[in-house]
């Protein structure tokens, strides 16, 4: 008999802000769920980055191409891309259909299905299982086959909410970019040990930086 699952409720597309930056902020404190025949893996989203319209670092900046079409789907669809031939990155489309923008899921706090995650990342401490975008996709078993998946459908791989209410959100500049480094488009849960990146980037949250479920 399986352990009782957390009562995570799928997020509907209409609940998602129709703005890339606000969506990246909104997703802090929400949940990423991966359902498998052998059980469920889930985690609380503690870090995201926004790649809005017109951002030269976005994969959508050059316009629609065969490889980036999922960024041009209506908000709430997965865009999965292999980076530097090493790690898959899980992004989500963030605007109206045909616009082209996205957010990157950078880290989660693992909650359900820890043995399943640990099997994919053996010998790794809990804190580091999904702390960073490449680690996240490895722990959850996310690859190219998930590109274009509707994350609002509540099956296979999906986004959800557990607690309704306000969540405090910190904001800093993004990580690992060679241009547009000054923009405050990285969002995180203050105090979380599962946030990636240099500790010096974890600045005091800006006044009023709260998101509501």
UniProtKB/Swiss-Prot annotation:
Q: What is its EC number?
A: 3.2.2.-
Q: Cross-referenced HAMAP family, in alphabetical order?
A: 3MGH (MF_00527)
What is the source species? Paraburkholderia xenovorans (strain LB400)
| Name of the protein | Putative 3-methyladenine DNA glycosylase
InterPro entries to which the protein is assigned, alphabetical:
Formyl_transferase-like_C_sf, MPG, MPG_sf
Q: Which UniProt keywords apply?
A: DNA damage, DNA repair, Hydrolase
- PANTHER family per UniProt: DNA-3-METHYLADENINE GLYCOSYLASE
Q: Fetch the Pfam families from UniProt.
A: Pur_DNA_glyco (PF02245)
């Amino acid at each position: 008999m399986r352990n009782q699952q957390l009562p995570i409720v799928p997020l509907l597309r209409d609940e998602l802000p129709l703005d890339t930056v606000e969506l990246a902020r909104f997703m802090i404190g929400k949940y990423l769920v991966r359902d498998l025949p052998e059980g469920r893996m889930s985690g609380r989203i503690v870090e995201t980055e926004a790649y809005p319209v017109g951002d030269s670092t976005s994969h959508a900046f050059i316009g629609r191409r065969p490889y980036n079409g999922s960024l041009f789907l209506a908000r709430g669809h997965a865009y999965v891309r292999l980076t530097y031939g090493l790690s898959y990155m899980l992004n989500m489309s963030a605007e109206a259909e045909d616009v082209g923008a996205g957010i990157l899921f950078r880290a989660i706090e693992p909650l359900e299905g820890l043995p399943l995650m640990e099997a994919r990342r053996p010998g790794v401490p809990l804190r580091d299982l999904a702390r960073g975008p490449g680690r996240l996709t490895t722990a959850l078993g996310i690859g190219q086959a998930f590109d274009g998946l509707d994350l609002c459908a509540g099956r296979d791989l999906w986004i959800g909410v557990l607690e309704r209410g306000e969540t405090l959100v910190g904001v800093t500049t993004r990580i690992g970019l060679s241009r547009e480094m000054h923009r405050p488009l990285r969002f995180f849960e203050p105090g979380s040990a599962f946030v990636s990146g240099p500790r010096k980037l974890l600045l005091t949250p800006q006044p009023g930086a709260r998101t509501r479920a």
